Amino acid sequence: MRLPVVLLFMALAACNPQADEQADKAVTEADRETVPALEDITGRWRVVSIDGETLSAAESEPYLAFSADAAGGSVGCNRFGGMALYAGGRIAAHSWGGDAMACIDPQGEWETAIAELFRAYPQVRLSGDNLRLRSREHVVELMRADGLGPLDRSPDPMRIPVPDLVSQDLANTEWTIRALDGETESSSPIDRHLRFYEETWQGLASCATLFGTYRREGNRLIVEGDIASTEQNCSPEYAALDTAFAELMRDDPHHLVGPNGELIIAGDEHVLTGDRAR
């Protein structure tokens, strides 16, 4: 009984060799993709396509650029960007802004897609001179434009220059939590905070205050031991924010302090953004 079925599949494969070739090509490309180091993506990249739509060559070439603490670019209308932390094959953006010129489509649609992409903590994969940024909703394909090396200015057009290096030490600092996984709603919208002491931290993202210990290794927070919590009494959607907050801190996340009082903490699946408390 099985022989006719086998023969049927063989016949279908023989009738559609192009589909097989495309599938093999997709598998091969996926096998070649790697998680790049920061130095592998630093620099300027030409935007090849956005969500499968190829961008035609123009006088003002669409591009994205990356530095150690920012990302930005243009698709022919506004310049846009923001403070960004790259770690573990993903990019976390603190905020995304730029020029305020009204753009006709398709540039307007492209700008919206790129903004949504960076707000969604996209994955980054490298294959030769090609870079792919992917979120659940959007995919941007890039091609290396200028080789490796530092840029002559920040990719973030909104960056306010500061004369000194920004300290990454978190001890004895207090932050207002701005968003967790892009979610700004909370059962405690006024009291959301994250405080670091010499060896301990505490934070309120939504319902319960979490407590734990930590140490720094470079730009990583190593959270050891249990994470304690006050009593949680809120609806499931708000309680989920507390769960995400705890998972983030257990990930031994990377962190970045920006020049204008910004904070990004990024783990495997979750991202917290905040601003220095005033």
Indicate residue ranges for each PLM-predicted region.
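Sec-dependent bacterial lipoprotein signal peptides
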Residues: 1-13
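Lipid interaction determinants
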Residues: 15-278
